[in-house]
């Protein structure tokens, strides 16, 4: 719903949405897409977990990688989980830079009565295979917090990729290496919640207005993010 609302706001302000169009590379005065050249003064790399790949194609690589996560959704049940609950391991997993699998408990109910059970983190490129062993580990940890979940059937499971930056901060701002290229990525699991504020900050910077927050921690040319020629990180 949040993404739908943001998209509607873009359209109300004159924005155009082109479904199924892939940006291939930057050229002077715009961007080359699978449907031809698109003229523009600025290109925003908001490609999420694919932001690192696009930055390579744009000639300004940044260290943003996909970090896979999975989630379980239970069948609807009477209102039992009244607040979002997570264990202490969750904070450590979010802040970790380890590429290996990490699971930590997050349990949250929805208005429809289903319960969301997470979470996992693992850097495996874009391998989107759903791993039963990972789902089982998440379920077992959730049952320790809420034993009644042991009797609740799982309705579905799904996974996705978070855009991971090595220092765990978003990448927001103009790229100093390529004029007209801007980045808005690296939020990992907080992207949808920070989307509106990120757009506001990016607009402030582009238009030369006083920024809504200090942009310095999110700058593109910080050591953890900027990849230079010959850098294999």
Please state what every model-predicted region is.
Residues 1-41:
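Helical element adjacent to the flavin cofactor pocket in flavoenzyme catalytic cores
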Residues 1-13, 120-124, 179, 185-187:
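Helix-loop-beta segment of a Rossmann-like dinucleotide-binding subdomain
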Residues 17-19, 45, 64, 183:
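General beta-strand structural signal in soluble alpha/beta enzymes
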Residues 30-32, 115-116, 171, 182-183:
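General beta-strand recognition
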Residues 34-37, 113, 190:
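Short acidic/polar mixed-charge low-complexity motifs
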Residues 38-50, 54, 199:
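Short hydrophobic core segments
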Residues 47-176:
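Active-site substrate-recognition segment that forms the wall
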Residues 127-233:
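C-terminal catalytic lobe of FAD-dependent flavoproteins
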